[in-house]
Amino acid sequence: MSGSKRFAVCRISAASLAVATATASLYAQDTRTVKEPVVPPACIILKSTLTTAGAISGEMETRASKAGSGQASLDTARIQQALDHCDKGHAVELDIEGSNDAFLTGPIFLRPGVTLVVDKGVTLYGARNAEYYAVKPGSCGIVSDDSGNGCKPLITVKSATGSGIMGDGAIDGQGGAKLIVDGKVSSKTWWDLAEDARDAGKLRDDAPRQQVPRMIDTDLTDDFTLYRITLKNSPNLHVAFHRGDGLTVWGITIDTPKTARNTDGIDPAQSSNITITRSWIRDGDDNIAIKAGDGPTTNMTVSHNHFYWGHGMSIGSETTGGVSGIRIQDLSLDGPDNGLRIKSNATRGGLVEDVIYDDICIRDSKIPILFDSDYSFPGKGVNQLPVYSGIELRNVRVSGGGKIQFNGFDHSHRVGVTLDGVLALDSPAHYKAQANHSDLTFGPGPVNLVFIGDDSTVNGKQVNGKLPGCAAKFVPFP
């Protein structure tokens, strides 16, 4: 970097830092007492009438499209009817019947207090006919200049407090399967539309958007639970939790190819009291992305999780409403493009503070750590400037090389981060560590990285040391 330099070092009191750290740990994070969920009793058990081969062949949907019969031959109506008539505190259960192990559905809607349970060995498939999801005729399954809301989600959870999705089965959005258009199998998949939108965006300033459905979209719903379910191949985001208080995600699996664009795993936004724990996530975008575009996101615990391919544990890019009180602990990131990431820019920035990462292992990532306040900045409008302060990295171990960067927006809008035990387990020489418009504090744990950059300070001392190894953290994807 032109003009890059090593920072001057000044010391701070380790005791003072320890007190501040302990105080921060007592507050924030999910304020609820979160326990392992319990599957509620069934109000009705629906038996499968389809094999997996029949559900994914597309034949049922092409016949229905040609006949103009809509979703009559799908499972949409009977699942929805069961959800509508189930008492609160109970579940609609999807079960195997002989060799039949699949359900095929268009958009469905959860109801307050009602849980959808997908039994072991059962897969609930999302239909491939874009007409079923269209908000208005022709609005879904295309690339257009609209905002990206042309499709209903596969599962809508709106004003449905106390609802959930559970079970040892799977929900498959068929994002990589060819769409059904006018009674024929088309040449495009949901994921192809995302690529088409990106290609079109390279030719113009205002990029068009793919109009594709999310898998699970919640809004104005408190105390929502995802438990043990496997989510696969969403056309877009797998789980969006918006304007809610109380989200529990426990023991789920998200499994989607790394090439599937915009397939975030879990995106909490404008919400509070969130726990995501004991889960395995790999997808084509952020494994988790904490957002705060229209309001604050606060009090969140991410614990005992394993991430694989994807764009890592992210905050942003929408941070206008403020993000605070976040605790991320016992996390392994094995081969992601990015590891730990805070991203925003001057069109959508805000204050990100009181975020603690603890006991983190990252290997084989191009960018193990990136806190960037100029992320994908389009160069228009500078009235929502991002500031990151009170960020702590504790017991973070990286291996495999890559970039570690802290980039504040300017001299007045900085990144403030404490590195309390941050080690390259191989060699610091394998990493390009940079800090610009940033204030770094080292200690009391060891830090063996050497940072260069501009307009930045370091309080503390770079020292070699030891932290627990990561071998046991990296487990195969289930």
Q: Model-predicted segments: where are they?
A:
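Extracellular "leader-to-stem" segments immediately downstream of a signal peptide or signal-anchor
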Residues: 2-115, 119-227, 250-258, 418-420, ...
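Flexible loop/turn segments at secondary-structure boundaries
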Residues: 26, 101-105, 111, 284, ...
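Right-handed parallel beta-helix
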Residues: 120-121, 161-170, 222-232, 245-257, ...
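Short, T/G/N/S-enriched strand-turn elements that build extracellular solenoid repeat scaffolds
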Residues: 79-85, 102-112, 237-243, 277-279, ...
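Extracellular beta-rich repeat passengers
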Residues: 339-478
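Active-site-proximal loop/turn and secondary-structure-junction residues that shape catalytic pockets
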Residues: 98, 243-245, 253, 292-294, ...
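Short glycine/acidic-rich loop motifs that flank beta-strands on beta-rich extracellular proteins
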Residues: 90, 105, 127-129, 174-178, ...
